[in-house]
Amino acid sequence: AASDVYKRQELGTQPIGKLLLQYAIPAIIAMTASSLYNMVDSIFIGHGVGPLAISGLAITFPLMNLAAAFGSLVGVGASTLVSVKLGQKDYATAQNILGNVVTLNFIIGIGFSILTLLFLDPILYFFGASPDTISYARDYMVIILLGNVITHMYLGLNALLRASGHPQKAMTATITTVIINTILDPIFIYLFHWGIQGAAIATILAQIISLVWQFKTFTNKNELLHLRRGIYKLRGTIVKNTIAIGMSPFLMNLAACFIVIFINKGLKEYDGDLAIGAFGIVNRIVFLFVMIVMGLNQGMQPIAGYNFGAQQYHRVNQVLKLTIYGATAVTTTGFLVGELMPELAVSAFTTHEGLIQLSATGLRIVVIFFPIIGFQMVTSNFFQSIGMAGKAIFLSLTRQLLFLLPSIILLPLCWGSAGIWWSMPISDLAASVVAGIMLYRQFKIFKTHGNKLKVEN
């Protein structure tokens, strides 16, 4: 446990650039791996099952988003709390948070599965399924939902591994899952001819294997955080605080879920089932870059949180700047790929000409303001890591509800399906402006605080 304490102190003393690399690189590798994981499923399904199966898979995105929303409600909230508690040297509470995460994920994971499985067909039709695509969507989702409690537990424990100073172990768990999934996918789809169900079975099996390994890590008595009797009973304050902090990513995912439903329904209306598949492909490509930025954000979180708690505002300032530079480099790369070679990127997923055309056109539009979106994502995450959940929620919801939703509804009235594609970059632009204003105001506050502290010390 002593080495863990020392590990936490390095967050307040070591050079920021070195720390950010040390914390962000494992998270970036893990996030890239998990978005590749989604891509691999799409690629094998696209080539091994067919273009309509890609549309069927894309229809399940909102439901997967919804499941992820409940996962992040617990995972993000608890890991932020653990970071703060370890910073305050309150190890007993940190232990209890770990136990409560296991209990909460169990309850939410099973509850979610039961409710969604009972009404699966109506949900999928509401999400934009058609008689041609429903069977693909249903086959995939039934298996994913049966394994939902495993997914929740796996994501929740991974967030805690990172927060308790083991970013490498969290990365290992994610990469293991991806590798196993990538090996099992072609075996189940091509060899056993299980179709889209094979992809779902591969996903859940891979998570089970990683989960077993995570439990092994957390049962080690020498760990600062370890599973033991008496920590599983839900405690009001822990549950309340976890949910309060996790509310921001939860609402973000919830909003994203509804956005995707509107996009899918709109595209289907103008361009038919294939257009939903096109959005699915564009989503996967864009997601790769977004996930890398999220990895950077995860690396920033413990550093910003700890130094904010220790009132070292100059270090908070430094880590934020570095993270924004990194994020902008990543999203600019995404912009170049989408503008210069969209057909190439898209053809990884399908050989179907019509689907390639629809997807490439969409990709070109979606990444047009991509260079500035990194800044907006970092800012929203920054407010979350220093415990200003309200501001983080406001930022993420302005993009989704204030800008994106109205655009998706109004723009197609003039421009048809192009309006739906254009609504995405337009709302990115607007949200970045809002983020810039909020960040500027926050730093004015830090400056006055920082000067006050210098005088006092």
Residue ranges and their predicted role:
Residues 11-48, 62-77, 81, 106-113, ...:
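N-terminal transmembrane alpha-helices
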Residues 36-55, 124-131, 187-194, 257-284, ...:
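Helix-terminus/linker motif at the lipid-water interface of multi-pass membrane proteins
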Residues 75, 144-162, 173-181, 199-212, ...:
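Short runs within selected transmembrane alpha-helices of multi-pass transporters and secretion channels
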Residues 54-114, 151-170, 278-336, 340-342, ...:
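Small-residue-rich hydrophobic transmembrane alpha-helices
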Residues 116, 159, 185, 189, ...:
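Structural signal for membrane-spanning alpha-helices in multi-pass inner-membrane proteins
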Residues 66-69, 181-186, 211-215, 287-291, ...:
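Hydrophobic transmembrane alpha-helices of multi-pass small-molecule transporters
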